[in-house]
Swiss-Prot record:
Classification of source organism: Bacteria, Bacillati, Actinomycetota, Actinomycetes, Propionibacteriales
Keywords: DNA damage, DNA repair, DNA-binding, Glycosidase, Hydrolase, Lyase, Metal-binding, Multifunctional enzyme, Zinc, Zinc-finger
EC number: 3.2.2.23, 4.2.99.18
Gene that produces this protein: mutM
Record's protein name: Formamidopyrimidine-DNA glycosylase
NCBIfam families per the UniProt record, alphabetical: fpg, PRK01103.1
GO biological process, one term: base-excision repair
Length: 295
């Protein structure tokens, strides 16, 4: 699934190519990607036709395009979604689901939503130009200037759950997915199962700093692409996968100590870590169940 760096690369591309464009026509080629829009495919298309795109914004893994009437086109890429800016005469992609014909952007372009697995989707958010209410509950991401480091540290240290699980909690911190959680934990030398309440404030701040570092590095390389499913708006893949230290490197030598990287199952996915640099936490001692009998 695309994470913060990949989604930010797409947002930046949309900002370059579609700002100021008017949506002249909307073709919904499959109803599933617009299933979250209660208007249905025809109502979705009608709500967008004639509207001008004012900006391109993101919160976590969600994208939205504010429109000139105060509404917004809200999108999530899911597992395999792509937002492509194409010339009108470009051949249709195999999994093209929604097409927006644009006027006034790069001498006429199309914004295409392509999604093989169709876990992603588009919808029109009424009054959602500033922040769609559908995603208002999602926390800010670590690259957001208004992200509250102190609050994040306090909340992590109040919880007994493993720190990787917390990094993936979009209500606590958004945009961090499996890849960058593993990479940040490797850089910080912290095991993902270490409970938050067993980390010092300094260690949590170090982990947050590493999360920012790895995401900024990924942004600089266009994101991480393991296959053709993640591309930017021009159809180009990122290459940060060449710079990964832990994720996807099971059995390969840790670049710090030489120990083989280990993979374990985690929340219907996989975690990758170095068992030496990131030692597993000791189990908590069970509370005594003995009952004292009075003399």
């Amino acid at each position: 699934m695309p994470e913060l760096p990949e989604v930010e690369v797409v947002r930046a591309g949309l900002e370059r190519h579609v700002l100021g464009a008017t949506i002249a026509r909307v073709d919904v080629l499959h109803p599933r990607p617009v299933r979250r829009d209660l208007r249905g495919p025809a109502g979705f298309a009608a709500a967008l036709t004639g509207r001008r795109i004012e900006a391109a914004r993101r919160r976590g893994k969600y994208l939205w395009l504010p429109l000139d009437n105060g509404d917004a086109l809200l999108g999530h890429l899911g597992m395999s979604g792509q937002l492509l800016v194409q010339p009108p005469d470009a051949p249709d992609e195999r999994h093209l689901r929604v097409r927006l014909a644009l006027e006034g952007a790069d001498e006429g372009r199309e914004l295409r939503f392509v999604d093989q697995r169709m876990f992603g989707g588009l919808s029109v958010s009424a009054g959602g130009a500033d922040l769609p209410p559908e995603i208002a509950h999602i926390a800010r991401d670590p690259l957001d200037p208004e992200f509250d480091d102190d609050d994040f540290v306090r909340r992590v240290r109040r919880r007994t759950s493993g720190v990787k699980r917390q990094l993936l909690d979009q209500n606590l911190i958004s945009g961090v997915g499996n890849i960058y959680a593993d990479e940040a934990l490797w850089r910080a030398r912290i095991h993902g199962e270490r409970p938050g309440d067993r980390l010092t404030a300094t260690r949590v701040r170090e982990l947050l700093a590493h999360a920012r570092e790895v995401m900024l590095a990924a942004l600089g390389e266009g994101g991480t692409s393991f296959d053709a499913l993640y591309v930017n708006v021009n159809g180009e893949s990122g290459y940060f996968d060449r710079s990964l230290h832990a994720y996807g490197r099971e059995g390969e030598a840790c670049e710090r100590c030489g120990t083989p990287i280990r993979r374990v199952a985690f929340m219907n996915r996989s975690s990758y870590f170095c068992p030496v640099c990131q030692p597993a936490p000791r189990r908590r001692r069970a509370a005594s169940s003995r009952v004292r009998v009075p003399d």
